[in-house]
Structure formats: structure tokens, C-alpha cells
Amino acid sequence: MEGALLGLGSTYRTLGDYENSTRVLEKGIKLFPENRALQVFYTMTLYNVKKHDQAMELLFKVLVDTTSDEEILNYEKAIRFYADKLDEVWK
């Protein structure tokens, strides 16, 4: 069922039906919160509906939660901190 929801949500997105894509992918994430692929495809839909900040925040969180790359993990704390602060300017 996870794959079916991902496929349907992705298809809606590629057809420009972002409302149904959002609905299907959010349902998938609710039912299968550990499925990172659903979350990544959801970030694509967020991007398409101009929710760039939400898309980037979720994508960064998925990245640091799933990577084994030591160079990224060295900066995990900073990536998590800045994930929802991309528009902030520090003075």
C-alpha cells in the first residue's frame, strides 16, 4: 500500500494535480510515518505549491535522519538548527 500511495501521489504531482498529490502523500505519511520515500516525494509537491521553506525543512530532516555520510553527520546539529530558519538573516 505504501508504494501505491507514493506512486499515485507522484503521478498526481507530475500531472499538475497538486491538491490530490498533497492529499494522497499526506495520507501516506500519516499511515506510514517511517517511510522516508513518501516524505521525499511530498517535498516535491510542497516545492510545486511554492512551500519551499517547508519542503527544504523536511528534506533536510530526512537527509540527516538517513545519511551515513560522515561529512554531513559532522554538521547534523547545525543542519537541524537551520532547517526551519533558512529565511532568517543573522545580525
For each predicted feature, which ranges?
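Solenoid-like repeat scaffolds
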Residues: 26-34, 64-69
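A contiguous pocket-lining binding segment that forms or flanks enzyme active sites
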Residues: 22-24, 34-48, 62
